[in-house]
């Protein structure tokens, strides 16, 4: 049981790291000397040093991506906190429903953010020769992992 709990905690922390990195790092869209994330657009020189950074568009679609990514982090942190609280207060045989629901909500929020970005990014990125960066891919990787950990929490029963 201890090994199972450790595995679940490691999975949850991995999801949190993926969510934080994908939200913070400036690599959602890259190409031809520029890198774009949810917060700013940066141009780089041939040597790789950052030349100019300016705030991202105030487009409402981009703001919805920002909001849902932040919500996914909040839900996942809250889920981890609730898991530790329930670990010590839940009666024997009880299930971690609340923890699982918040983790599933985190997964759905990150899926919504990545989907909105995929569909609507041409509206605020006019450069069509770019490609998706690693932070965008990390967001998509965090989605199934968050759902998986949420389902594991819902199925998991507390033992002594």
Swiss-Prot record:
<keyword id="KW-0131">Cell cycle</keyword>
<feature type="topological domain" description="Cytoplasmic">
    <location>
        <position position="1"/>
    </location>
</feature>
<dbReference type="InterPro" id="IPR003936">
    <property type="entry name" value="PMP22"/>
</dbReference>
<dbReference type="InterPro" id="IPR004031">
    <property type="entry name" value="PMP22/EMP/MP20/Claudin"/>
</dbReference>
<keyword id="KW-1133">Transmembrane helix</keyword>
<keyword id="KW-1003">Cell membrane</keyword>
<feature type="topological domain" description="Extracellular">
    <location>
        <begin position="120"/>
        <end position="133"/>
    </location>
</feature>
<dbReference type="InterPro" id="IPR004032">
    <property type="entry name" value="PMP22_EMP_MP20"/>
</dbReference>
<comment type="function">
    <text>Might be involved in growth regulation, and in myelinization in the peripheral nervous system.</text>
</comment>
<dbReference type="GO" id="GO:0005886">
    <property type="term" value="C:plasma membrane"/>
</dbReference>
<feature type="transmembrane region" description="Helical">
    <location>
        <begin position="65"/>
        <end position="91"/>
    </location>
</feature>
<keyword id="KW-0325">Glycoprotein</keyword>
<feature type="transmembrane region" description="Helical">
    <location>
        <begin position="2"/>
        <end position="31"/>
    </location>
</feature>
<protein>
    <recommendedName>
        <fullName>Peripheral myelin protein 22</fullName>
    </recommendedName>
</protein>
<keyword id="KW-0338">Growth arrest</keyword>
<keyword id="KW-0812">Transmembrane</keyword>
<keyword id="KW-0832">Ubl conjugation</keyword>
<comment type="similarity">
    <text>Belongs to the PMP-22/EMP/MP20 family.</text>
</comment>
<dbReference type="InterPro" id="IPR050579">
    <property type="entry name" value="PMP-22/EMP/MP20-like"/>
</dbReference>
<feature type="topological domain" description="Cytoplasmic">
    <location>
        <begin position="157"/>
        <end position="160"/>
    </location>
</feature>
<keyword id="KW-0472">Membrane</keyword>
<feature type="topological domain" description="Extracellular">
    <location>
        <begin position="32"/>
        <end position="64"/>
    </location>
</feature>
<feature type="glycosylation site" description="N-linked (GlcNAc...) (complex) asparagine">
    <location>
        <position position="41"/>
    </location>
</feature>
<dbReference type="GO" id="GO:0051726">
    <property type="term" value="P:regulation of cell cycle"/>
</dbReference>
<dbReference type="Pfam" id="PF00822">
    <property type="entry name" value="PMP22_Claudin"/>
</dbReference>
<feature type="topological domain" description="Cytoplasmic">
    <location>
        <begin position="92"/>
        <end position="95"/>
    </location>
</feature>
<feature type="transmembrane region" description="Helical">
    <location>
        <begin position="96"/>
        <end position="119"/>
    </location>
</feature>
<feature type="transmembrane region" description="Helical">
    <location>
        <begin position="134"/>
        <end position="156"/>
    </location>
</feature>
<dbReference type="GO" id="GO:0032288">
    <property type="term" value="P:myelin assembly"/>
</dbReference>
